[in-house]
Amino acid sequence: HGRIRRQRQMCIRDRPKSMRVTVSGNLHPSVQPKDIILYVISKLGTDAGTGHFVEFAGTAFEQMSMEGRMTICNMSIEMGARGGMIAPDQTTFDYVSGREFAPKEEALKQKIAYWKTLPTDEGAAFDSEHHFDAADIRPMITYGTNPGMGVKIGETIPTSDDASFIKSLNYMGLKAGSNMLHMPIS
């Protein structure tokens, strides 16, 4: 009596595939991190990341605040990914330094030295790669029921004969071909 029997459970998962999404060049001044990820999802689809872990790379992410990077990585799940990451750099180190639960002094120096080894090696192979020009990205708005249904503000809602697309527009009270510029945002 008094014995506790422990059982172990495990979740069997396949090793995730790797995907790199690179956004290079100069962003329009009004573009925010959420616009970037909505643009990527609108181009690749909400299932593009299924079974993948996504690395976001390129100048658009390198120049982004830590909070913006968190937005991007958090929304990687909206494209079906298991997770997202952006290589640690000085922005990361500055963000961590001085935080309440961050390592202090020598311990922080050691952590930063290790974190500097984590970025992907030059020439690394990915299961899939996607490249976007930052200049093509503008503020985005979604018109449907998932983040893949997005257009640049000022563009029209596309047309489609797909039943789920039509159902989504009906649910949102919108019509294909309508210009999003004059639509109220709710």
Q: What is the role of each PLM region?
A:
Residues Q7, P16-R20, G51-F53, T71, ...:
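Broad gene-expression machinery/nucleic-acid interaction feature
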Residues I12, P29-P33, I37, S65-I72, ...:
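Generic structural signal for well-ordered, non-membrane alpha-helical segments
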Residues H1-I12:
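Single conserved hydrophobic/aromatic residue that forms the stacking wall/gate
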Residues G51-G83, P88-F93, F101:
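Catalytic cofactor-binding cores of redox enzymes
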Residues M79-S186:
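Accessory "access/gating" subregions that flank catalytic or transport cores
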Residues R13-R15, P29, G45-G49, S65, ...:
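Solvent-exposed alpha-helices and their adjacent loops that cap or buttress functional pockets
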Residues T22-G25, G58-A60, E100, A134-D136:
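Short, structured patches in soluble enzyme cores that scaffold and shape functional sites
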Residues R13-V54:
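Catalytic alpha/beta core of large soluble enzyme barrels
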